[in-house]
């Protein structure tokens, strides 16, 4: 065991460290933390997975504009096809980091619907921004809002299909909550499927789903 836990620091230094805890470590503590190590990056090259959505911009542009170089690392962006693929590559080590859904991180950390592995959220890339979309076919029949959708489903009963991008993602949670608020059971009254974000519009166009 090192002396890190037993080293006595002035009260003023400890209070300063607490004040900046959200953004970094005070110099006195940093010196102790790195007494046995180095400030050099653990890896010179880091592979970061992303799905082509607007909130991946921070990752992609950091590489394009060379922001990574001043920190002594090289970012290798890796375009992925689905959130499930990103999850699997994070778990097996093919990716070092990834642009992911908050719910995906917690799902992996808790071992929900797959292998359990410790995860950490290092940066927030967006704050919500999701939207719920209904097909033009439904809109043409008056389903331009939730009440209209509920009325149409009662008037024309059939299997209605809605898509979300990942079972533990906020998209799924918002969709389920939205449907349930109108008395529509998202697990019994409609069919819910998983579709990767880049494939949503194409699936809507060919009629594979009624909304997402």
Language model segments and positions:
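Short amphipathic alpha-helical segments with coiled-coil-like heptad repeat character
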Residues: 1, 23, 74-78
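Loop-centered beta-sheet repeat module
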Residues: 200-212
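Short, glycine-/small- and polar/acidic-enriched structural segments
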Residues: 36-187, 191-195, 210-211
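N-terminal secretory signal peptides
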Residues: 1-13, 22
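N-terminal export signals
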Residues: 13-33
């Amino acid at each position: 065991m090192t002396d890190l836990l037993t080293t006595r620091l002035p009260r003023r230094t400890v209070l300063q460290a607490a004040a900046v805890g959200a953004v970094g470590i005070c110099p006195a503590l940093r010196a102790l933390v790195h007494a046995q190590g180095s400030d050099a990056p653990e890896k010179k090259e880091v592979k970061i997975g992303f799905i082509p959505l607007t909130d991946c911009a921070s990752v992609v542009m950091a590489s394009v504009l060379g922001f990574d170089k001043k920190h002594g690392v090289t970012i290798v962006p890796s375009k992925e096809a689905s959130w499930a693929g990103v999850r699997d590559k994070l778990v097996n080590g093919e990716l070092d980091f990834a642009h992911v859904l908050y719910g995906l991180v917690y799902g992996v950390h808790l071992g929900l619907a797959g292998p359990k592995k410790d995860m950490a959220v290092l940066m927030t890339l967006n704050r919500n921004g999701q939207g719920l979309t209904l097909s033009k076919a439904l809109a043409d029949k008056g389903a331009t809002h939730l009440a209209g959708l509920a009325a149409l489903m009662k008037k024309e009963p059939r299997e209605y299909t809605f898509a979300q991008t990942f079972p533990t993602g906020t998209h799924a949670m918002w969709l389920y909550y939205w449907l349930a608020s109108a008395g529509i059971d998202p697990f019994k009254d409609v069919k819910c499927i998983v579709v990767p974000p880049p494939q949503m519009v194409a699936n809507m166009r060919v009629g594979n789903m009624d909304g997402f």
